[in-house]
A protein has these predicted regions:
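Adenosyl-5′-phosphate
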Residues: 40-44, 376-383, 402, 406-634
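Short acidic/histidine-rich active-site segments
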Residues: 379-389, 395
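Acidic, Ala/Val/Gly-enriched low-complexity intrinsically disordered segments
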Residues: 2, 17-19
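Intrinsic-disorder-associated, low-complexity terminal segments enriched in Asp/Asn/His/Tyr and depleted
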Residues: 3-5, 24, 39
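Cysteine-centered motifs
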Residues: 31-34, 40-41
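ATP-dependent adenylate-handling ligase core
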Residues: 252, 310-374, 397-409, 425-429, ...
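Cysteine-centered catalytic environments shared across enzyme families
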Residues: 42-356
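Phosphate/ATP-binding catalytic cores across multiple sugar-kinase/actin-like superfamilies
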Residues: 253-274, 367, 372-379, 548, ...
């Protein structure tokens, strides 16, 4: 049977024939008794809601369908529309089989509350168990728990949820509504304001950019409450609210176990899934934990985990990912792309990711190409390693942090801006092909644990043998049954766009140089007064972006400011040389390791032989990165 096939196959859903077999089973048996019922629930989707429209019902429905269709790549399996007076709610669903059941928008048993959700509630069982009044779910979707949570706790219900989500709850009893976004902004959400006074919510900007007079990113960790016609913050963790520095000493065992729990929570899946594996520390830890848990779980739906990496031929990431995959035992897929394939995809990437930020586009393009192949292989969910650098100070420029206070403030600012950069890239580039990305490093509980650690423990101190993300590496550096090879566990940080191949960035610069004339660039401020491009590459992306999204409101959804190796502007003051570096890539600070250790900690290279092995092991990687950069330029 198809069910047995899933259990024994070395590759999930390798052909359309298997999916058709599954669909046939769903037609022959009730969903309640089907052994594949757990694979039916909707997950990563696209949502659109319009409240207070002045249009007649027929025109409102037509407008709703038009906007929702632009989100169909996020949920290509089924569409659901509901009109309630002058309000419209639409849902584009990603499902495995039997698209006629479990559709959204969904309602409570009394048909009073309507939910339209995109995301994943990992603690849905706990939410149901803690309800003051028992609730019998109508479907197998974890997101349905939002409805009884709202009925039980009112506007405070998001505090009871753990996951990644953006959703709208409409209460027909008083014609009120609440929109909500998760604590970090892992899933995208925008709010728009129509000329007729209507309020819009959409998973992506493209659903509302030509229908709303103005729009903006919905702030993470907030709800929009129609009763006050404004935002209210629901996420108030201690690391944000406290004015002094956290002082908890690092407990390596507790840190490791906390992250393992975060990964395992995200292995809850209704679909065939895999991991994105660059070969760097973050994604490698995620993959290793997944494999360990699957090996220990006799009921694991698939016998082996599939991992995926992308890069130009002979790129650093492909080599490192293969090494990790061989160590942990995944079925690995190295996906090579050519520079021309990347260039051909740039316009589509900007359309899907909805940004003109240079580093985001550089990194999104190979991820976009990889996601297309992942979807073609039958995978609909992947785990990824985004967020670790923001939580542990993993970017190379953190070597220049002058003190613990500056280090911690930069971490907080980076986390607060994740929804505009890495989360935006990871979600939109991957979901552009109907694949759901999950990011365990941004788990609610793990984040509070990691951000409660004394920042002095996270700082880079070569005289103490501490390289970037030292405490994370140390937490997983075990001798018995090691998680990763030492060469990977202590490998230097690479930005994703660097790791896939240095010539990718150099070619992008060359193309921009050819496309954007000196005269065009000289008058950049006249054409783009907001976030004026500082390089020809930035001008090139901005030009494409405004052809797709011509509204001034669209440009203002993208953050600006100068950056070095993904820094915020505040960190530019850490080193005078940052102001003169012309590239936003991590390559711009490739030599920062030696400089920072020597200048910041007054440690001479001649004394490096006395440093701990972990710090010494990092130098070859840094040297190799600089050598490859020089070769690429030559």
């Amino acid at each position: 049977s198809a069910y047995q096939y899933i259990q024994i196959s070395s590759f999930p859903f390798p052909s359309l024939a298997v999916e058709r077999t599954l669909q046939h089973i769903s037609l022959q048996k009730s969903c309640l008794i089907c052994p594949l019922r757990q694979y039916c629930c909707p997950k990563m989707c696209g949502i659109l809601a319009i409240f207070g429209s002045s249009l007649p019902e027929g025109e409102l429905r037509e407008l709703l369908m038009k906007g929702s269709k632009r989100l169909r790549h996020r949920g290509p399996d089924w569409s659901g529309y509901q009109i309630h007076g002058n309000n419209g709610i639409a849902h584009e669903r990603l499902a495995i089989m039997d698209p006629a059941s479990g559709a959204q928008p969904m309602t409570d048993h009394d048909d009073n509350v309507v939910l339209c959700a995109n995301g994943e509630i990992y603690n849905y069982k706990e939410v149901y168990a803690a309800l003051p009044t028992p609730y019998n779910p109508k479907s197998g979707s974890d997101c349905e728990c939002v409805i009884p949570a709202y009925l039980a706790y009112g506007k405070d219900f998001p505090n009871h949820l753990r996951g990644m989500f953006s959703f709208v709850v409409y209460d027909k009893r008083d014609n009120s509504y609440i929109a909500c976004r998760d604590h970090i902004g892992i899933t995208p959400l925008y709010i728009g304001y129509g000329k007729d006074g209507s309020v819009w919510f959409a998973s992506e900007m493209k659903a509302l950019h030509d229908a709303c007079a103005r729009y903006e990113q919905f702030p993470p960790g907030h709800i929009y409450n129609s009763k006050i016609q404004g935002f209210e913050r629901w996420y108030n963790p201690e690391y944000i609210t406290r004015t002094d520095l956290p002082s908890n000493p690092v407990d390596y065992t507790a840190l490791r176990e906390s992250f393992e729990r975060a990964v395992v929570r995200r292995m809850m899946s209704d679909v065939p899934w895999g991991v994105l594996l660059s070969g760097g520390l973050d994604s490698s830890l995620v993959a290793s934990i997944c494999v360990r848990h699957m090996n220990d779980d006799p009921n694991a739906p698939f016998p082996r985990l599939h991992s995926f990496s992308v890069g130009l031929k002979d790129s650093p990431d492909l080599k490192a990912a293969k090494e990790v995959a061989e160590h942990i035992g995944t079925i690995h897929h190295n996906m090579e792309y050519t520079i021309q394939e990347g260039l051909d995809a740039i316009r589509d990437v900007i359309h899907h990711v909805e940004t003109y930020d240079v580093t985001t586009i550089r990194a999104s393009t190979p991820m976009y190409l990889m996601s297309r192949k992942i979807k073609a292989m039958g995978i609909k969910m992947v785990l990824s390693g985004e967020g670790a650098d923001e939580v542990f100070g993993g970017y190379l420029y953190f070597h220049k942090a002058p003190n613990a206070q500056e280090f911690q403030e930069e971490l907080k600012e980076k986390i607060n801006r994740l929804h505009m950069y890495d989360c935006l890239r990871a979600n939109k580039a991957v979901s552009s092909w109907g694949v759901e990305p999950r990011v365990p490093f941004l788990d609610y509980d793990f984040l509070e644990h990691a951000m409660g650690i004394d920042p002095n423990e996270k700082m880079i101190k070569r005289d103490e043998g501490r390289i970037e993300k030292y405490i994370l590496r140390k937490a997983f550096d075990v001798e018995e049954n090691p998680y990763l090879p030492k060469s990977v566990l202590w490998r230097q940080k690479e930005q994703f766009s660097d790791g896939v191949g240095y010539s990718w960035i150099d070619t992008l610069k060359e193309v921009a140089e050819a496309e954007i004339t000196d005269d065009m660039f000289t008058h950049a401020k006249n054409r783009y007064p907001y976030n004026t491009p500082q390089t020809k590459e930035a001008y090139y992306y901005r030009q494409i972006f405004e052809e797709i999204f011509p509204s001034p409101a669209a440009a203002q959804t993208v953050p600006g400011g100068f950056s070095i190796a993904c820094s915020t502007e505040r960190a530019l003051a850490w080193d005078a040389s940052f102001a003169t570096r012309g590239d936003a890539s991590g390559r711009a600070v490739a030599g920062v390791h030696d400089d920072a250790y020597t200048e910041g900690h007054d440690v001479k290279k001649a004394n490096s032989k006395n440093a701990p092995a972990a710090a010494a092991a990092e130098e070859p990687a840094a040297k190799k990165a600089r050598t490859e950069e020089e070769e690429a330029k030559a």
